[in-house]
Amino acid sequence: NLALSDTNGETKLKLPLRSKSFFKTNIEELYQLGAASIHPNNQFDNFKEVKVEIKKLDDVKIVNKIGFIKIDVEGHELEVIEGAKNTIINNMPILLIEIEKRHTKEPVEKSINHIKKIGYECYFVKNEELILVDKLKDKQLENNYYFLPRNFKQDL
């Protein structure tokens, strides 16, 4: 098992535990079933911890060019990006990143602006169309953001 971050070493992965009841009445419990996380701000009511190795993507030997990276790490996005910065700059892949304020308590714009600084534009999909994110509205319910290199030629 390996988790990506901005350092190499070991950490604890929090795994939400399933209720013994087959019938789910708590919506939050349904959410937590797929929400394992190494991010310290994520708190679960009922979980177990498992030691996992963490590594920077920059330190993983990759021989082929990378064209696409998907990141869904429940609040640990900036750490993964920092640990993958050289890989991202050298390959300039399309990035699909889930970013939600509820995981970090930080504004979504903080993560978006950080990624834009390394040469990307940010988009979200609405009605099967890529919409450029220039300024997010307060109540906008987007969480999957596409980051395309600024020089990306798109036929969309």
Residue ranges of model-derived segments:
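Phosphate/nucleotide-binding beta-alpha loop and adjacent structural elements of enzyme active sites
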Residues: 1-156
